[in-house]
């Protein structure tokens, strides 16, 4: 065997090993709060990540509609369809909704056009005709992804369709702990217990509103403390490790409760007080509320590091060989701001 042939063979073998190493990493980007009326330069950065999947965590359009024709929602979807880059449509997409693509700010089961909004939502995402969400009430779903020898159980919750009405006060939402108060509704809870029992190495739970934080005045699971405890107990009673992804807040952060980690990523293009009219509204608010809205030093007992108020996205890199998940929150340029490494 001549030397030239040997060198070529070694080179091809090296390339093969390199490709095998790359193939063992599965990348999932995620984010929330995507305003169709604003520029979306962040997609260019995310394209460079060469992700396998993207998870939309709610407020994927801003189309609040209080009339039965849902004209504002239809227009919002029409505009957003033009904004979503073509390369993204070739990836595996997972999506849940929050209040602004549900149809009403901070809305729940009292929204009388929720059935119509659900069909518009599914049409926008080109959900297949046999998608269970086409025939069920609510947009919750369960999907299994196999990555080499790893099995991911992606569970998307609907925190709007069945949710009991809330009571808003000047200092935030009043906690409601009556027995009939619900976040998910009876049918979705039954389904969730079943979804959690699926054999998997890692659960990725999608909730549009935050699960772990308790100390801020905005929407969160803690508004229904019994429901939050119920969810944490359900997650604590299974052996599979869980990562919660959430949005809504127009800020990003990392939270930890025992073996459960929650990553909040928000917003993709709508940072807090980014426009002149939002700044005007903030200036008209009481100082105490304004400070809580824009102060990145908000603290919570489960919070790790300071919150991020600039435009951001999340990136989850799953290493099936070393059985680890690296979760990063990145800015619009792709620079990591915070990271969290979790063993599977």
Regions found by a protein language model. Name each.
Residues 3-12:
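Sec-dependent signal peptide recognition
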Residues 23-344:
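Metal-dependent phosphoester/phosphodiester hydrolase catalytic core
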């Amino acid at each position: 065997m001549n030397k030239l042939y040997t060198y070529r063979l070694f080179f091809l073998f090296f390339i093969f090993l390199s490709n095998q190493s790359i193939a063992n990493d599965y990348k999932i980007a995620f984010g929330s709060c995507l305003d169709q009326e604003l520029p979306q330069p962040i997609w260019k950065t995310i394209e460079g990540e060469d992700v396998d999947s993207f998870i939309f965590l709610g407020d994927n359009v801003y189309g609040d509609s209080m009339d039965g024709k849902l004209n504002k929602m239809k227009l919002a979807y029409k505009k957003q369809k033009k904004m979503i880059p073509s390369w993204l449509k070739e990836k595996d997409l997972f999506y849940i909704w929050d209040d602004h693509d549900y149809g009403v700010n901070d809305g729940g089961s009292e929204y009388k056009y929720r059935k119509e909004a659900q069909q518009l939502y599914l049409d926008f995402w080109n959900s297949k005709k046999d998608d269970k969400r086409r025939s069920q009430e609510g947009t919750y779903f369960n999907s299994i992804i196999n990555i080499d020898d790893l099995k991911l159980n992606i569970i998307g919750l609907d925190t709007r369709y069945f949710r009991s009405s809330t009571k808003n006060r000047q200092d935030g939402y009043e906690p409601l702990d009556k027995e009939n108060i619900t976040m998910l509704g009876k049918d979705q809870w039954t389904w969730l217990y079943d979804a959690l029992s699926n054999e998997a190495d890692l659960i990725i739970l999608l909730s549009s509103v935050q699960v772990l934080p308790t100390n801020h005045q905005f929407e969160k699971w803690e508004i229904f403390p019994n429901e939050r405890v119920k969810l944490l107990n359900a997650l604590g009673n299974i052996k599979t490790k869980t990562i919660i992804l959430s949005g809504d807040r127009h800020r990003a952060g990392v939270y930890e409760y025992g073996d459960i980690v929650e990553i909040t990523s928000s917003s993709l293009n709508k940072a807090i007080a980014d426009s002149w009219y939002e700044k005007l509204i903030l200036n008209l608010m009481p100082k105490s509320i304004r400070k809580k809205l824009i102060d990145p030093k908000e603290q919570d007992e489960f919070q790790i590091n300071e919150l991020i108020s600039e435009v951001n996205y999340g990136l989850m890199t799953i290493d099936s060989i070393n059985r680890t998940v690296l979760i990063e929150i990145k800015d619009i340029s792709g620079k990591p701001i915070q990271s969290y490494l979790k063993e599977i």
